């Protein structure tokens, strides 16, 4: 067995209506301009996306959107998200949706502060700093 230390600070918020506090938590963790990343189907139909946007607006936070996540997300959307973060001055990536949205948003957050190709991370290259990231 290899010796190691694992440290993973995580903050969980659960409960009915908690999406209405999204803006509060984004601010608390240092976000000021947010990339909202989502698939598009149920998050729109349920009104979740609108409630998250309203919460961000209520806290005076700016945001840009990148929808269209499909199951087993494609790298093209990740590259698009990375460029959007860089060009728009985004400092917080917020995933609104399920597993594929979470996967691609983490890749966007890692790639937005990295000078190389985000795919390097999937080949074992270490990340030397972190980007603010959240999931709803």
What are the roles of these predicted feature ranges?
Residues 1-92:
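ATP/NTP phosphate-donor binding region
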Residues 76-136:
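Glycine/threonine-rich beta-strand-loop-alpha-helix active-site module
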């Amino acid at each position: 067995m290899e010796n190691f230390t694992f440290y993973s600070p995580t903050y969980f918020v659960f409960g009915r209506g908690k999406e209405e506090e999204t803006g509060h938590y984004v601010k608390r963790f240092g976000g000021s301009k947010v990339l909202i990343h989502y698939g598009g189907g149920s998050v729109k139909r349920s009104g979740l996306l609108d409630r998250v946007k309203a919460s961000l607006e209520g806290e005076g936070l700016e945001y840009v959107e990148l929808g269209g996540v499909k199951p087993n997300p494609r790298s093209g959307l990740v590259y698009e998200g990375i460029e959007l973060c860089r060009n728009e001055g985004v400092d917080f990536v917020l995933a609104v949706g399920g597993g594929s949205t979470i996967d691609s948003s983490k890749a966007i957050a890692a790639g937005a502060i990295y000078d190389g190709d985000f795919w390097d991370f999937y080949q074992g290259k270490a990340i030397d700093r972190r980007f603010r990231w959240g999931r709803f």
